[in-house]
Amino acid sequence: MDLPTTVVRKYWTFANPNRILHQSVNQTFDVRQFVFDTARLVNCVDGDGKVLHLNKGWLCATIMQHGEASAGAKTQQGFMSIDITGDGELQEHLFVRGGIVFNKSVSSVVGSSGPNESALLTMISENGNLQVTYVRHYLKNHGESSSGGGGCGAASTASAVCVSSLGGSGGTRDGPSAEEQQRRRQEQRHEERRKKSSSSAGGGGGGGAGGGGGGGGSGGQHSSDSANGLLRDPRLMNRQKERRPPPSSENDGSPPLREAKRQKTTAQHEGHGGGGKNETEQQSGGAGGGGGGGSGRMSLPLDTSEAVAFLNYSSSSSAVSSSSNNHHHHHHHHNAVTDVAAGTDGALLLPIERGAVVSSPSSTSPSSLLSLPRPSSAHSAGETVQESEAAATAAAAGLMMMRRMRRAPAEAAEAPPQSEEENDSTTPVSNCRVPPNSQESAAPQPPRSPRFDDIIQSLTKMLNDCKEKRLCDLPLVSSRLLPETSGGTVVVNHSSVARTAAAVSAAGVGPPAAACPPLVTTGVVPSGSVAGVAPVAAAIETPAAPPRPVCEIKPYVVNPVVATAAAASNSSSSSSAPLPPPPPPSGGRRGRARNNTRGGGGGGGGRNSRRQAASSSSSSSRRSRRRNNRHEDEEDNDPLLRLSQVAGNGRRRGPSFLEDGLEIIDPSEEAAIAAASIAAFFDD
């Protein structure tokens, strides 16, 4: 026998709707409000229906979408509620929960409160029209009559709250119970999902209990599902929650996870005494027992349970142990302080005790210093602490000395020693900036080697002087053309040669300045060589050339008189007849054209050739005069050419890649300059 089914249909049509509010809180929460002039309602229950007209009023729609889509479904879960007023009174309030889809113009939700009940709510707002459609079907109660079903067909909510429920009809008890069951099923599914996704253990709180009215039931369900939807957010579900297990049964109250980490950390660094106990247990036992036998056990602090917590804890325990015997060895312990500076990477800063013997760094390592045994008795503990601190200071001193020897150059000379106070205050130990140490004011500075400190200071001074452009005071040899005497002799500047020789002799490279007499070099300087460099190098007789600029650009100037004299001196040794001076360039070009006769015989074209030669010589002389006038104007304005007029009339030449490029100083010359500079600093 088929059970009777009740179907409720409602169709709202609004005239002249105007949207006055549209607030989108986020991607899943949307509120829209409209005002209208008139409205018409078509209300149908099963086979009956009626029409209702309303005057001016407003409509408010709330759309909420939360959580993830259910398995096999393309829509997300949510709810939609619509409240309608007209003639100053509340006329309708609709609420449906289920799969929801909404956009700018259409919002629709389809829900099912159980296997025997389902509902549909749709709102369409486009082209100046606003329509709301609501359809719901459910099974009738056995005790419900047809009139009761008709009265219940005028229900206004999806939670089966009928209009007659306000009067206490029997059909009102069926709707809330089904809604409550549906809510409980959803909560159970949410709880299972939270457990599977490793969510928090106490996460799923039940929703509010549904009351007799539709507003109360919907409000409790709304709060429950909104919270469940927030927890079902995949971004929050993928995040690992912090587990907080109950504290262990031990008296320290620390969680078992931290206890296991502490035991693992302390087990890796075992001591060599105390009946097989590790160092951390002995230290904690000694501190807890007031310096006694160390039988009590004290756990690590909560803030030192990291992987390197044993470093900080060992250092603090050693400070506690040493402070317990402070009245016996106060005069020895006030200079050695062992602590960890705040903000460092966990390494121990071990200042060197004054008067400590520096040993080889290979004999003792910082890792072995941390695992030194400490006896349980008070007096023997103080002595062992003193021995371990002395070994630590010796190892640290050896490390510092090796670092300084690595930085100090082997060729630097020894500087006069300075006082220990000056070394402690001014000498940098490392190139990196060490973070400020809170124990620096109380801890004494370690003794340093005077020899290496002076070398470091000298090198630092040299680097600072290099930065300030006052590296050395060696004179630079000029690259200009040297003046020439009447006999073809080039005279070198005696003062510059003497200063250069004195500087090089001071550097220990060549002979002293007294062994260098005033130099006069007979001969000429070729046009393709650097003037003034080769004679100075030959006069000093050093394996390296005198200091010159790193790069120099030679001027585009040649000396034709010097070149002619060089050619004359070379030809005088081979033949008695001197060579004629070279013809001008224009005459040379015309001469080549004149020698190339076009006729076959020489006698027939003699006159023509002489006329051509005369005309060409006259025209070339006119052009050369104009060119010379232009050259004279350029030479008057060129200071470089005026300098070259001392040796004769100069002229410009074209650039040459072989002679006019950048000249690079040899590495040996740079080494000589550096050696002279270092020697000058040490002589000061």
Swiss-Prot record:
The keyword Phosphoprotein applies. The isoforms p34, p43, p50 and p84 are cleaved by host calpain-1/CAPN1 and calpain-2/CAPN2 to generate p20, p26 and p28. Residues 180-191, 232-245, 258-272 have a biased composition (Basic and acidic residues). Its main location: host cell. InterPro entries: U79_P34. It is found in: Host nucleus; Virion. Residues 425-442 have a biased composition (Polar residues). Pfam families: U79_P34. The keyword Phosphoprotein applies. Isoforms p34, p43, p50 and p84 self-interact and interact with each other via a shared N-terminal region; these interactions play an important role in their intranuclear targeting and in the recruitment of UL44 to subnuclear sites for viral replication. This is Early phosphoprotein p84. It comes from Human cytomegalovirus (strain AD169) (HHV-5). The lineage of its organism: Viruses, Duplodnaviria, Heunggongvirae, Peploviricota, Herviviricetes.
